[in-house]
């Protein structure tokens, strides 16, 4: 058995090497970006959900730069961020341009910190992204709090930290955080009240044969509050009919859009995949911003897509397609391939309403030009 496993492993390594060599030849020495590395990640038993998100984040340059900068800070005790910075540093400092790296340390730490991921089952890539970004933000805020208490940050207002005031934003917030404003207009007195809500990613509903722009328009549709759902107006001091809508008040540097492709079907007693065809453009301008938006005309470029392959949330596979400099790459665990920009259309989804196996965009990463 051991001999068979060894032979299988050697064959796998040979395949990885051949793939890496082919990629390097296809890009060519003159076109290969300076100081760039394209490394696949070994799958440790259904960890494609993790590998695909890590590759997408690695090619979100502002995020990569912050993680690598964290590596150069004084050594801290091991946590998910130190493991991530070690992994990114390992990729960025390889002598070879292409190859494969095992993210074993990161996966081990992830499984130790969250029981949701402590198994060999397929997990949801969006849940992992959400957990990772929030965990990194928590780590950075806790470290900042400790530095203030130890007097390493001048004018650190420790009292503020202890009075339940909002902690200082971290570079995770600077990169990914946007703000939504929930506007409610009373139809009796016309008074508008608004409530702000921060987000690190936006989850949008999907419909058949539509586009991301259409999905975002649906996200901001006006809803009428009436009957038993009437709104309590402070001005009228009674429940009134009202119009409610969500708008974007502050756009993030990197906009992460999650397409809600998994829907619970009562008759099946399980989640099924909506393989609907949803077109996502290479360039995006958001239109559903509030009147006092800080940057209403921000233009975005698509830099990465996490793709779900399969028919349901707990089965199937995840891959990532990323833009690096002027070309596109497909990362499928340890395999890395160069693809044409036109090939991205293959990941829009299917025109059939039937739940089938499909390769469809699940999380989109758009980076602001300014």
Swiss-Prot record:
<comment type="function">
    <text>Deubiquitinating enzyme. Has almost no deubiquitinating activity by itself and requires the interaction with wdr48 to have a high activity.</text>
</comment>
<feature type="binding site">
    <location>
        <position position="189"/>
    </location>
    <ligand>
        <name>Zn(2+)</name>
    </ligand>
</feature>
<dbReference type="GO" id="GO:0004197">
    <property type="term" value="F:cysteine-type endopeptidase activity"/>
</dbReference>
<dbReference type="InterPro" id="IPR018200">
    <property type="entry name" value="USP_CS"/>
</dbReference>
<dbReference type="GO" id="GO:0004843">
    <property type="term" value="F:cysteine-type deubiquitinase activity"/>
</dbReference>
<keyword id="KW-0862">Zinc</keyword>
<comment type="similarity">
    <text>Belongs to the peptidase C19 family. USP12/USP46 subfamily.</text>
</comment>
<dbReference type="InterPro" id="IPR001394">
    <property type="entry name" value="Peptidase_C19_UCH"/>
</dbReference>
<keyword id="KW-0833">Ubl conjugation pathway</keyword>
<dbReference type="InterPro" id="IPR038765">
    <property type="entry name" value="Papain-like_cys_pep_sf"/>
</dbReference>
<keyword id="KW-0645">Protease</keyword>
<feature type="domain" description="USP">
    <location>
        <begin position="39"/>
        <end position="369"/>
    </location>
</feature>
<feature type="binding site">
    <location>
        <position position="186"/>
    </location>
    <ligand>
        <name>Zn(2+)</name>
    </ligand>
</feature>
<dbReference type="GO" id="GO:0005634">
    <property type="term" value="C:nucleus"/>
</dbReference>
<comment type="subunit">
    <text>Interacts with WDR48.</text>
</comment>
<dbReference type="GO" id="GO:0005737">
    <property type="term" value="C:cytoplasm"/>
</dbReference>
<dbReference type="InterPro" id="IPR028889">
    <property type="entry name" value="USP_dom"/>
</dbReference>
<keyword id="KW-0378">Hydrolase</keyword>
<feature type="binding site">
    <location>
        <position position="236"/>
    </location>
    <ligand>
        <name>Zn(2+)</name>
    </ligand>
</feature>
<protein>
    <recommendedName>
        <fullName>Ubiquitin carboxyl-terminal hydrolase 12-A</fullName>
        <ecNumber>3.4.19.12</ecNumber>
    </recommendedName>
</protein>
<dbReference type="GO" id="GO:0006508">
    <property type="term" value="P:proteolysis"/>
</dbReference>
<keyword id="KW-0788">Thiol protease</keyword>
<dbReference type="GO" id="GO:0005886">
    <property type="term" value="C:plasma membrane"/>
</dbReference>
<feature type="region of interest" description="Disordered">
    <location>
        <begin position="145"/>
        <end position="167"/>
    </location>
</feature>
<dbReference type="GO" id="GO:0031647">
    <property type="term" value="P:regulation of protein stability"/>
</dbReference>
<feature type="compositionally biased region" description="Low complexity">
    <location>
        <begin position="155"/>
        <end position="164"/>
    </location>
</feature>
<feature type="binding site">
    <location>
        <position position="233"/>
    </location>
    <ligand>
        <name>Zn(2+)</name>
    </ligand>
</feature>
<dbReference type="Pfam" id="PF00443">
    <property type="entry name" value="UCH"/>
</dbReference>
<feature type="active site" description="Proton acceptor">
    <location>
        <position position="317"/>
    </location>
</feature>
<dbReference type="GO" id="GO:0016579">
    <property type="term" value="P:protein deubiquitination"/>
</dbReference>
<dbReference type="GO" id="GO:0046872">
    <property type="term" value="F:metal ion binding"/>
</dbReference>
<keyword id="KW-0479">Metal-binding</keyword>
<feature type="active site" description="Nucleophile">
    <location>
        <position position="48"/>
    </location>
</feature>
<dbReference type="GO" id="GO:0005829">
    <property type="term" value="C:cytosol"/>
</dbReference>
<dbReference type="InterPro" id="IPR050164">
    <property type="entry name" value="Peptidase_C19"/>
</dbReference>
């Amino acid at each position: 058995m051991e001999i068979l496993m060894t032979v299988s492993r050697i064959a796998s390594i040979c395949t990885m090497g051949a793939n890496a060599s082919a990629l390097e030849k296809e890009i060519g020495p003159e076109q290969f970006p300076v100081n760039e590395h394209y490394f696949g990640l070994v799958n440790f038993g259904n960890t494609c959900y993790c590998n695909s998100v890590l590759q997408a984040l690695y090619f979100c340059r502002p995020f990569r730069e912050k993680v690598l900068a964290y590596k150069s800070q004084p050594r801290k005790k091991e946590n998910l961020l130190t493991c991530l910075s070690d992994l990114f540093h390992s990729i960025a400092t390889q002598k070879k341009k292409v190859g494969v790296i095992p993210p074993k340390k990161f996966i081990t730490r992830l499984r130790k910190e969250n029981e949701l991921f402590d198994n060999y089952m397929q997990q949801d890539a969006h849940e992992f992204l959400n957990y990772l970004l929030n965990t990194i933000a928590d780590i950075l805020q806790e470290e900042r709090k400790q530095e203030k208490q130890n007097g390493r940050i001048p004018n650190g207002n420790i009292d503020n930290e202890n009075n339940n005031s909002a902690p200082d934003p971290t570079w995770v917030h600077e990169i990914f955080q946007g703000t939504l404003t929930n506007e409610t207009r009373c139809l009796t007195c016309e008074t508008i009240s608004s409530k702000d809500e921060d987000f690190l990613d936006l989850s949008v509903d999907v419909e058949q044969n539509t586009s991301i722009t259409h999905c975002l328009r649906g996200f901001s549709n006006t809803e009428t509050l009436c009957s038993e759902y009437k709104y309590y107006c402070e001005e009228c001091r009674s429940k009134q009919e009202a119009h409610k809508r969500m708008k974007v008040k502050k756009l993030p540097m990197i906009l992460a859009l999650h397409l809600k492709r998994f829907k619970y079907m009562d008759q099946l007693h399980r989640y099924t995949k909506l393989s609907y065809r949803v077109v996502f453009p290479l360039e995006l301008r958001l239109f559903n911003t509030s009147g006092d938006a800080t940057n209403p005309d921000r233009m975005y470029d698509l830099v990465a897509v996490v793709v779900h392959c399969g028919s349901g949330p707990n089965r199937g596979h995840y891959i990532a397609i990323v833009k690096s400099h002027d070309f596109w790459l497909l990362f499928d665990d340890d395999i890395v391939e160069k693809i044409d920009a036109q090939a991205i259309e293959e990941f829009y989804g299917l025109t059939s309403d039937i739940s089938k196996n499909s390769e469809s965009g699940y999380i989109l990463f758009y980076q602001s030009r300014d």
